[in-house]
């Protein structure tokens, strides 16, 4: 099945919008994510989990898996380095411990070695297998027949062309991905 184009929205007045496509699926014990990105430059300065990956070429999945208002931010740079946070609001988020981040299987078309910004058009992909145990503040046993609130993002805060894209529109003036009130709905079969 061909990739469906991600609904894109630049939430800051910026003419630059990289091309981003993604797929999401689930198994009996994991969420599967695959992002394809084409952008004018690419950077992967962070190679250790729970670092500032959003400043690199980064894709993100935010979700409320248990319907209780507590959301997880799973952020991944273009070499598969991740950050996982949890909490009800932007402030005071708790980072996942190493034993949790280590559960996420990752693959990147650019390998896993950090590098400074490469100013050239680059296509890259990243795939993640996120076991339900990554939602470490909850006991998620299955997503079968469930609806969850979520959003998908592409950013590059410190690239030569900073950008902030979201799948579900964020209807505020300044970019803020930590707005679960603007999450869309995912329906799992």
Q: Model-derived features: where do they sit?
A:
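Surface-exposed, glycine/proline- and aromatic-rich loop segments on solvent-exposed faces
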Residues: 14-90
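Generic short beta-strand segments
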Residues: 8, 36-41, 131-133
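Beta-strand-rich interaction surfaces with strong enrichment in secreted/lumenal proteins
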Residues: 12, 20-23, 106-118, 174
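Acidic/polar low-complexity flexible segments
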Residues: 50-59, 63-75, 138-189
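Surface-exposed molecular-recognition determinants
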Residues: 111-114, 135, 148
């Amino acid at each position: 099945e061909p990739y469906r184009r991600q609904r894109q929205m630049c939430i800051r007045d910026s003419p630059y919008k990289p091309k981003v496509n993604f797929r999401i699926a689930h198994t009996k014990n994991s969420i599967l994510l695959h992002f394809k990105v084409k952008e004018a430059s690419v950077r992967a300065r962070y190679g250790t989990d729970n670092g500032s990956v959003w400043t690199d070429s980064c894709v993100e999945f935010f979700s409320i898996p248990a319907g209780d208002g507590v959301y997880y931010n799973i952020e991944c740079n273009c070499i598969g380095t991740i950050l996982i946070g949890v909490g009800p609001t932007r402030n005071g988020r708790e980072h996942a411990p190493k034993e949790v981040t280590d559960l996420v299987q990752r693959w990147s078309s650019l390998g896993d070695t950090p590098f400074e910004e490469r100013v050239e058009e680059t296509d890259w992909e990243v795939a993640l297998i996120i076991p339900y145990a990554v939602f470490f503040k909850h006991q998620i046993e299955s997503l079968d027949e469930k609806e969850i609130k979520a959003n998908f993002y592409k950013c590059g805060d410190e690239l030569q062309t900073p950008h902030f894209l979201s799948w579900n529109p964020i209807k505020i003036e300044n970019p803020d991905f930590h707005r679960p009130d603007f999450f869309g709905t995912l329906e799992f079969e």
